[in-house]
From Swiss-Prot:
Organism of this sequence: Homo sapiens
Highest classification ranks of the organism: Eukaryota, Metazoa, Chordata, Craniata, Vertebrata
GO biological process, one term: neural crest cell development
Family: Belongs to the KBTBD8 family.
Subcellular location: Cytoplasm, Cytoskeleton, Spindle; Golgi apparatus
Main location: cytoplasm
Protein name per the record: Kelch repeat and BTB domain-containing protein 8
Kelch repeat windows: 336-390, 391-441, 443-481, 483-532, 542-588
Source domain of life: Eukaryota
Cited function: Substrate-specific adapter of a BCR (BTB-CUL3-RBX1) E3 ubiquitin ligase complex that acts as a regulator of neural crest specification. The BCR(KBTBD8) complex acts by mediating monoubiquitination of NOLC1 and TCOF1: monoubiquitination promotes the formation of a NOLC1-TCOF1 complex that acts as a platform to connect RNA polymerase I with enzymes responsible for ribosomal processing and modification, leading to remodel the translational program of differentiating cells in favor of neural crest specification.
Length: 601
């Protein structure tokens, strides 16, 4: 009887055998993908399609109502509203290109969409009509990643038309950052009055003189003088910060614009000229940035000090992500800072073989953070980054793979418009601890007995006359049409402070006076071009004995080169031991914005 009672509590199964197992919610993780794949197959083969969509130029697409309704509120309303279209076998859509409709349908059946500069705006328009925000956001993300001085105004106008907040904000941010380049473009003249004001009325405008803002307004006005003259007083009132302009410039303003300025002052009312906020670009200061520097109070963690030599102030820049070391560093002609490759420090004190990384990052000045960019095709430590012919090149370096340490021949090129890396012709010889510079659309690479040049247009490497004293781990920079190569290590591992200059036009090396340096201070040097002059940043270590105890002290100094007298002069010494510099520290020079950095001293 008891057994019968137990059986009565069991759950019946399809074959009649009772089961005491609890119910389970089984799920096939591939079910949704499988259905989508089958729907795509039926779409491609025209099976069970029940609606034909006609777009511009009479192009038609046979598809499934339920799929269209599932991804688009526009189609769902069309097919379920009870209106004429809900029963028609064919519907016509106005304002959608055939390629855009094909891309929308491909997204509906596969969740994928292929974007190009040629199709992205038309696809965004179609997604706007069909109310598919996921496609709009993908298009916006693509346009943001492909902003440049030539297209940024057009993208901003496009975003403003469709009311896409992020695309509008990011394109406007880019325009302000690259303002002087952007205002030269023809699209700048197409801005409406309100769009122009929204760009110019900002503290974040990257101009070093307020006169640039005034000149951009005049250029915009002269494009359509009759229609735009009435707007000048309002634009001047909202956008020009006259206290920041030179009196001599204001005095030369033509009477026509002076009258508009007078009206603008009436519209604006009285203001406190002493409290006029400077634009972001007016606060920029050229600084020397030291990478691979460890703060003396934080163990071995890296910090990135920035030295304002003119004012004596010291700031701190956001350290590279993942504490990357021995990265390739580049400051572009547009003052963008890039780092690539490197390695992440090991937790092991005895580990010397580091895993190479393929990271690529760009520094965002306004937020003091690093933005991720497409990874290198080849991981590499200590590569050299060079800007040439509008593109960036990652050259050589080393990895720890297979049988140990290997130098690299490989070279890759980054195109910011395409936002991707491509492989180019490798160097004839593998190189690490090398140097690379650019001059007149050619790249020059130096290491020991090898001196190479690269022509990007021909994708070709060639050999040049090597330096008279072959050295590795030296320092190179272009100065006054010559490549200076300073210091380094010769074949017997002896450190040298030889200075040579290569006249690029004459293909000739000339010895200069050695850099005066005492070997006993164990110096490490870095060569930079600061304020258009050649400088050496020197880390010196002195060891003293006090009461039978060895003590070390370090000094970081800056020496300026006088090419007429052929001599070096100390012009700056850093504050005493704010940080320590490792042997592999690197220096770069860029214009930075103090209010965006953390002040140290």
């Amino acid at each position: 009887m008891a057994a019968s009672a137990d059986l009565s509590k069991s759950s019946p199964t399809p074959n009649g055998i009772p089961s005491s197992d609890p119910a389970s919610d089984a799920m096939d993780p591939f079910h949704a993908c499988s259905i989508l794949k089958q729907l795509k197959t039926m779409y491609d083969e025209g099976q069970l399609t029940d609606i034909v969509v006609e777009v511009d130029h009479g192009k038609t697409f046979s598809c499934h109502r339920n799929v269209l309704a599932a991804i688009s509120p526009y189609f769902r309303s069309m097919f379920t509203s009870g209106l004429t279209e809900s029963t028609q076998k064919e519907v016509r859509i106005v304002g959608v290109e055939a390629e855009s409709m094909d891309l929308v349908l491909n997204y509906a059946y596969t969740s994928r969409v292929i974007l190009t500069e040629a199709n992205v705006q038309a696809l965004f328009t179609a997604a706007s009509i069909f109310q598919i925000p996921s496609i709009q956001d993908q298009c916006a993300k693509y346009m943001i990643s492909h902003l440049d001085p030539q297209n940024s105004i057009g993208v901003f106008i496009f975003a403003d038309h469709y009311g896409h907040q992020e695309l509008g904000d990011r394109s406007k941010e880019y325009i302000r950052k690259k303002f002087l380049c952007v205002t030269k473009e023809q699209e700048f003249l197409q801005l409406t009055k309100d769009q122009l004001i929204s760009i110019l009325d900002s503290d974040d405008l990257n101009v070093d003189r307020e006169e640039h803002v005034y000149e951009s307004i005049i250029r915009w006005f002269e494009h359509e003088q009759n229609e735009r003259e009435v707007h000048l007083p309002e634009i001047f009132a909202k956008c020009i910060r006259f206290p920041l302009m030179e009196d001599t410039f204001i005095e030369k303003i033509p009477p026509q614009f002076a009258q508009a300025i007078a009206k603008s002052c009436v519209e604006k009312g009285p203001s406190n000229t002493n409290g006029c906020t400077q634009r972001l670009g007016m606060t920029a200061s050229e600084m020397i940035i030291c990478f691979d520097a460890a703060h003396k109070h934080s163990g071995k963690k890296q910090t990135v000090p920035c030295l304002d030599i003119v004012t004596g102030r010291v700031f701190k820049l956001c350290k590279p992500p993942n504490d990357l070391r021995e990265v390739g560093i580049l400051v572009s002609p547009d003052n963008d800072i890039y780092i690539a490759g490197g390695y992440r420090p090991s937790s092991s004190e005895v580990s010397i073989d580091h895993k190479a990384e393929n990271d690529f990052w760009m520094y965002d000045h306004s937020t003091n953070r690093w933005l991720s960019k497409p990874s290198l095709l080849r991981a590499r430590i200590g590569c050299k980054l060079v800007y040439c012919c509008g593109k960036m090149y990652a050259i050589g370096g080393r990895v720890y793979e297979g049988d140990g340490r290997n130098s690299l021949k490989s070279v890759e090129c980054y195109d910011s418009r395409e936002n991707c890396w491509t492989t180019v012709c490798a160097m004839p010889v593998a190189m690490e601890f090398h140097n690379a510079v650019e001059y007149k659309e050619k790249i020059y690479v130096l290491q020991g007995e090898f001196f190479l040049f690269y022509e990007p247009q021909k994708d070709y490497w060639g050999f040049l006359t090597p330096m008279t004293v072959p050295r590795i781990q030296g320092l190179a920079a272009v100065y006054k049409d010559s490549i200076y190569y300073i210091a380094g290590t010769c074949g017997n591992h002896q450190r040298m402070f030889t200075v040579e200059a290569y006249d690029i036009e004459l293909n000739k090396w000339t010895r200069k006076k050695d850099f005066p340096c005492d070997q006993s201070i164990n110096p490490y040097l870095k060569l930079v071009l600061f304020q258009n002059k050649l400088h050496l940043f020197v880390r010196a270590t002195q060891v003293t004995v006090e009461e039978h105890v060895f003590r070390t002290s370090r000094k970081n100094s800056l020496y300026q080169y006088d090419d007429i007298a052929d001599q070096w002069m100390k012009v700056y010494e850093t504050p005493d031991r704010l940080w320590d510099l490792g042997r592999h520290f690197e220096c770069a020079v860029a214009k930075l914005y103090p209010q965006c950095l953390q002040k140290v001293l």
